[in-house]
Amino acid sequence: EYYAGKYNIDPLILYSFIRTESNFNPNAQSNVGARGLMQITEETFDWIKLKIAPSEDLTFDDLYDPETNIRFGTYFVSYCLLRYHDDLATAAAAYHSGWGTVDNLLSQAEYSSDGETLDHYPYPQMRLYVRKITNSYQRYQDIYNEK
């Protein structure tokens, strides 16, 4: 929740990403080598490190540390949300498939009516991922708003 506050993100959004990416397993590793709670790839780790921790002696293996992983993952989610105008679904698509893919889709009227948010997802894996994130977020909102 510290990093949610630091980057001004609803913590429930972060829970949704962590649940979807690793089911809260800090030692998770994907078949493409993404690591930790928020399943960050080495390329993404290197990019984020330049942005938020250039002088820190961190390695890709440090992503197995929950605090480091959440710190880096939260920055990445916040960047995606900022880039895509706080639209969670489009930001989730970018987190999953990359900005290049999403930016390309945004330029096509069949996928985006406004050029800023995605209306449709052409790839089944992207569509499933976005649905998992948005459904998890809705469930967390329902649970925590009942209290």
Predicted segments with their positions:
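Catalytic glycan-binding domains that act on GlcNAc-containing polysaccharides
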Residues: 1-147
